[in-house]
Amino acid sequence: METLKDLEALKQAPICHFFRDAELERVYNAGKKLTLKKDQVLFSENSVQETLYIILSGKMEVYKKQKQIAVREAGDFLGEMAFLESNPRSASVRAFTDAELLEIDKKAFFKFFAPNPKAVWEILKVISARNRADLDVIVASYQEIRNSREKYR
């Protein structure tokens, strides 16, 4: 019963829309399900892991130096930067609410996602949208600093 609920949640994730039910079940079985309580840390900045996470339920908070960067929800993925670059984690992530996630390692990713151009394209679109949002924040912050400097001249 729990597996059916998880598979249904996984099916809602945009990066999994392209899998047929049997493939989706294989993806799920190749991953590792994690259950986190509110405020429980999934990973910390600078930790070394090469895993990607898909949120099955709940919300996760991405933060750096205790400043919130983003809140991700069911269907979203996270941990992609360290996963793709094989570098330490660039931020920390904790459960914003109780949450369930599917942890995907590189072996499973290359077996199921990499051969699927539509899934890879969806991942690229999400990363691009996140970069665009980050640029908007940077520009707004720069403008705020500039306005503050002019105010005190």
Can you annotate each of these PLM segments?
Residues 1-153:
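Cytosolic regulatory regions built on CNB/CRP/Popeye-like sensor folds
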